[in-house]
Amino acid sequence: MKKKTVLIHSNFCRAFTGFGKNKKNLLRYLFNTGKYNLIELANGIEWEAAQTETVPWTCRGALPHPSEIQGLNPDQQRQEGYGNKLVDKAIEEFKPDVYIGIEDIWAFGGYSNKPWWNQINTMVWTTLDSLPILPQAVDFAPKVKHY
């Protein structure tokens, strides 16, 4: 039976952040089952950063090269910090069966309009830690198969 390819997109699993630790725990568990072909898309590091070679699964950074970010406006720079363009490259290259995005809701702006969004199984795991719940989260929920 062919293994399902699962792309997990969040902070780098070795980053000292809540998202990083959460992602590390999830990746370790799934890796140890031996059932999945895992792809880590890591916010905060570049596509082929040296750190991508330090984990036992395939890992790519979601951060473009600094020269690509310099000409962008602040909003575009923030979006690229969350991998807005490189997520498309990862989807194209690795052809995952499942995309799991784990991040604050503003990291996923425009994702539901991406051509691949409804072509694969998508899941967003986001923090809902404010009251009232941010309108972005309420608007995005019906656009995600697994929220």
Provide a role label for each language-model segment.
Residues 50-146:
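Extended catalytic core of nucleotide-activated donor transferases of GT-like folds
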Residues 1-49, 53, 94:
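N-terminal subdomain of nucleotide-sugar transferases
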